[in-house]
Amino acid sequence: MSREPNVIYVGRKPPMNYVLGIPTSFSGSNAKVTLKVRGQAITTAVDAVEITRHRSMKDLSIGKIAMGTEEMPPREGENRARMVSTMEITLILQ
């Protein structure tokens, strides 16, 4: 979870951790939740959204999907920057 109430940063945890976090983020007056993800965690985010939509929150829809690429600094021992895919998935509660 993040400091922003309607943003979830997806990382290395299993998809079910995010499946439980998505309904919690809709508490109060939040009608939109955004999942921000990059790199190999994109598959985890997609799995979490699909599990949530089909099993627990039938009234959840995907509002917007934004894809892009970020330039990351080189790792130790590497001499050039690397490009990493990014994705933002906005979920809307109807």
Give short role names for the model-derived ranges.
Residues 1-26:
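Histone-fold modules and their flanking histone-like tails across chromatin and transcription assemblies
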Residues 6, 29-31, 85-87:
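Core residues of folded domains in eukaryotic genome-function proteins
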Residues 9, 34-36, 88-90:
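Beta-strand cores of modular interaction/reader domains in eukaryotic scaffold and signaling proteins
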Residues 13, 38, 92-94:
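Structured beta-strand/turn binding interfaces of compact recognition modules in eukaryotic regulators
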Residues 28-49, 53-54:
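Charged, well-structured alpha/beta interaction segments
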Residues 63-94:
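C-terminal edge-of-domain segments
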